[in-house]
Amino acid sequence: MIKETEQIPGPRPLPVVGNLFDMDLEHGLECLIRLADDFGPLFQITINGEKQIFATSQALVDELCDESRFHKAVMGGLEKLRMLASDGLFTAYHGERGWGIAHRILVPAFGPLRIRNMFEEMNDVAQQLCLKWARQGSSTSINITDDFTRLTLDTIALCTMNFRLNSFYNNETMHPFVKSMLYVLRESDIQSMLPGIANCIRVKARSRMSKHIQLMRNMARGIIQERRDQAEPVDDLLNTLLNGRDPVTGEGMSDDLIINNVITFLIAGHETTSGLLSFTFYYLLQNPHILERAQNEVDEVTGGERITVQHLGRLTYIDAILKESLRLMPTAPAFTVTPKKPEVLGGAWAIDAGQAVNVLLPVCLRDRSVFGPDADEFRPERMLEENFSKLPPNSWKPFGNGERSCIGRAFAWQEAQLVVAMVLQTFDLVPDDPSYKLRIKETLTIKPDGFRVRATLRRGQSATGLSQGSMSASGATSSVASPGPPAATGAQSNPAGGQRISFFYGSNSGTCKALAHRLASSLMGRGFTEQKLAALDTVVGNLPTDQPVIIVTTSYDGRPTDDAEEFVRWLESKRPVLQGVSYAVFGCGHHDWAKTFYRIPILIDDLMHKAGATRLTALGTANAAVSDLFSDLELWEETNLLPALREAFPPSNSSDVESSEPHQLQICVSKPRRVDMHRGLVEAKVTAVRTLTSPDSPEKRHVEFHVQGDTTWRPGDHVNILPVNPLSTVSRVLAYFQLAPDHSITVNSFNTQGLPSATPVSATELFSSFVELSQPATRKNLKALAMAAESKTDEQELIRLHDSYDALVRDKRVSVLDILERFPSISLPIGIFISMLPPLRLRTYSLSMAPSFKPSHGSLTFSVINEPAWSGNGQYLGVGSNYLASLTPGSLLYLSPRPAKDAFHLPADQFNTPIIMICAGSGLAPFMGFIQERMTWLKQGRPLAKGLLFFGCRGPHLDDLYYEELSEFEDAGVVEVHRAYSRAPDDVRAKGCRHVQHRLVTEAEAVRDHWGRNAIVYVCGSSNMARGVQTVLEEILGTLPPERYVAEIF
């Protein structure tokens, strides 16, 4: 039995005017929100003689979104807007025939791939915004809402209609369409609230509205006619409007329907998005910690390089910020539904068929029963995917509901993500008026009113640099003819074998060289022949045109590797003509070096394409911070490179086919040999070693060495070390393959992956010095191992490992050797095993001795990694650290100094520039060099500015590194040391502090004093420590300019 329904509450209406006096024509939304507070989750008012019901809770909205019971109603201001857009997608009545035709034609035009393909046009307009702000300078007060309106209007016109409004080239006034639109939206809202008689006497207002409507429709007609006059068709939304056919009726759209939807897209495609962007930046500037996290995410994901569509999916915090902004300020603040038949809403309130019910989003989306007691606060974490996915149904509806929801949501979202990311990447923003309180400007949509900002370019960028960057990004190019081989007219195959390929790399430490060798080896087994494998500098001016060119390279602090400098210089300055060259680029990077992430691979890829070369496939990338480089290379090879090669250079005969068997190296036993396969290394002699920690703490060691010749470095620099695999790991290999340590192995193969070729090497030397034994197995390795397993159970388990690769193999550091030992039924020839192993790479460490302190000497301070393996198989031994720990005085090691980024060096003016050094554990290494350099200066009689060191460790008798040396330096006035002990915070030296960030708070006054004297802050340590330090420093000091806050993360 249905219980008796209740009367819907609300303020008492007056005769004739209803609740008009309960509303404010300028701030109607604010009035409705107040009424929701007064009357609860469902209330009603009478406006213009009609009853209007408003729902304000998630539970009621969940019912109203049931399309089997309710459908969209076009009422109020939206109905008045039909004078402009009639049966356009947004203003059409439910079931209106024109809406059905347009909807069925247009929905496919907003599919994911089509939206992704609009990215470059979105990027074009976003760059115009950034260039305008950059040229105006940091002293200019920016009306951010107006500029976002220019941006979003230009973007929708360009992306969907290939029509440039060029709003940023008319800085003083808005485009006439915007002025007319704002008037029509506002007037529609006002007319919906006034009695009919009042509207009748507003003759001038109605006349102005008619003129504005005519202007907007004439503009739409002009856009349509210009397209019809074009000889060449353009595949965009406007083309779909003009030429699309309804798959149900076979009809196209009438001219009026086309005009209605052109106007609809120009309005709906920009008005709400500009409001979203404006509110988002308001909330970010009100919450600096959120702004910092967002900016850090952009830097980490993009690496400071040109934003691409692939980056957007990784901007998870930006995504949450936008969702949270729309939750608090839904820019289309209501949608209206009506029941198909009489309904009882919420089990209590009767709703007649045809009665409009408005979903009041600014209240619904702050429902405390869903979003908690802090629902009014801006907290993006609640919108991260793991939390967002757990919200009750229909809790977040800013884009409307069901079949009448916004079909351009993906367009708006991609645009908003791009713009937020680009602005955060390019500028530091501050409010123009720090005391500004949010005011809302209402039409049928909402935006901030009077919100202005100032924008300062980040990281020393310039407006000129942005201009040049945008030209490059948009594809502008000029070329100068240069002599070279004639362009190839088609794909050619090598009659002696498969299609020839040349591989070129840029590699300082050997990683990219190893990747190039691995890629060459893999393709050799797929019907291709290696023509050449060499450094990029060897091919300057002579790129082959009769075969594909594959490039594997990286960046070092934004610069090319040593063996690619001439090649990049040639591309940049000589502007060669590269027609006939077919190429693909694979780039490596690490997101901790955010400013220069993938810079050189992207640069090479872009310059070669602009010089006329044919890009075989999109740039492949691998981020060493979050993935396995070799697995990423294999994935790119399988999904991108190989299909492109097969299409561009098809096999010339049946023998040129991909082998299903892994390539097996040809092996014979011979005499031993040891070689140095890496360029640029110098020999050093170990002069001293010592353990810096007690037996009760994880081991940290000091290794000092002497280098002859003119090898130099600066305090703060790094050094690449050529290691040797731990003997225990090598012994496992020898035992598995039943080799004696002094067995000789000779590698005879057309591709040796950087191994010594046709030269006998002892088994111990081969597995110690030439290959990575602890590298995680790749997906391709797992496939081959599964094929080699004789046990069906083992085969199935290996397939399971392949299918759950990240969790079960990569993240647990499971090597090929681990798998062989775990699955004894695998029968794997040693040649295939060796072919699965990447070449042994160099390891990088910070130097911990200043060359001025002890000429021709250097030292390393490092943690020795010897811990239970995450795979569960014995101990995991860090290759580099265990090698260094095995050295004794007199041992030889091979190394190559490598400069740190410029900012991570002592200031040039040490007399006037204090320094603040913050670190934990072995992060002390570079600062020992800093302090020693300062000691040298002091001994030379040079005055020094103050220096503070904040150092964290476990305790005074555990791992308080270099305690005696630092005490001497402190006594000499070189540095002032502040310690934190995680296991002994009560020690007098720690002053109750467990971590360095706690000690920073304790010494906040000294930190502020040094900062006020233009100190530079240096941080070295783990990412967790660095984040904590930065948070505390922001609280103490405020904004940290990048030139004065420099972090090195390991």
UniProtKB/Swiss-Prot annotation:
Residues 679-907 form the FAD-binding FR-type domain. Coiled coil: none annotated. Heme binds at C406. Residues 501-641 form the Flavodoxin-like domain. Residues 459-495 are annotated as: Disordered. Residues 459-481 have a biased composition (Polar residues). CYP505E3 can be used to synthesize the high-value flavor compound delta-dodecalactone via two routes. The first is the conversion of dodecanoic acid into 5-hydroxydodecanoic acid (24% regioselectivity), which at low pH lactonises to delta-dodecalactone. The second is the conversion of 1-dodecanol into 1,5-dodecanediol (55% regioselectivity), which can be converted into delta-dodecalactone by horse liver alcohol dehydrogenase. Keywords: Electron transport, FAD, Flavoprotein, FMN, Heme, Iron, Metal-binding, Monooxygenase, NADP, Oxidoreductase, Transport. Its EC number is 1.14.14.1, 1.6.2.4. Binds 1 FAD. Binds 1 FMN. GO terms for molecular function: aromatase activity; flavin adenine dinucleotide binding; FMN binding; heme binding; iron ion binding; NADPH-hemoprotein reductase activity. Pfam families: FAD_binding_1, Flavodoxin_1, NAD_binding_1, p450. Its cofactor is FAD; FMN; heme. It catalyses: 2 oxidized [cytochrome P450] + NADPH = 2 reduced [cytochrome P450] + NADP(+) + H(+); an organic molecule + reduced [NADPH--hemoprotein reductase] + O2 = an alcohol + oxidized [NADPH--hemoprotein reductase] + H2O + H(+); decane + reduced [NADPH--hemoprotein reductase] + O2 = 3-decanol + oxidized [NADPH--hemoprotein reductase] + H2O + H(+); dodecane + reduced [NADPH--hemoprotein reductase] + O2 = 5-dodecanol + oxidized [NADPH--hemoprotein reductase] + H2O + H(+). GO terms for cellular component: cytosol. InterPro entries: Bifunctional_P450_P450_red (IPR023206), CysJ-like_FAD-binding (IPR003097), Cyt_P450 (IPR001128), Cyt_P450_CS (IPR017972), Cyt_P450_E_grp-I (IPR002401), Cyt_P450_sf (IPR036396), FAD-bd_FR_type (IPR017927), Flavodoxin/NO_synth (IPR008254). FMN binds at residues 507-511, 585-617. In the N-terminal section; belongs to the cytochrome P450 family. Self-sufficient cytochrome P450 monooxygenase that catalyzes the regioselective in-chain hydroxylation of alkanes, fatty alcohols, and fatty acids at the omega-7 position. Performs hydroxylation of C10-C16 n-alkanes and C12 and C14 fatty alcohols; and thereby enables the one step biocatalytic synthesis of rare alcohols such as 5-dodecanol and 7-tetradecanol. Converts 1-dodecanol into 1,5-dodecanediol as major product with very little sub-terminally hydroxylated products with the 1,4-dodecanediol and 1,6-dodecanediol more abundant. Does not use hexadecanediol nor decanoic acid as substrates. This is Self-sufficient cytochrome P450 monooxygenase CYP505E3. It comes from Aspergillus terreus (strain NIH 2624 / FGSC A1156). The lineage of its organism: Eukaryota, Fungi, Dikarya, Ascomycota, Pezizomycotina.
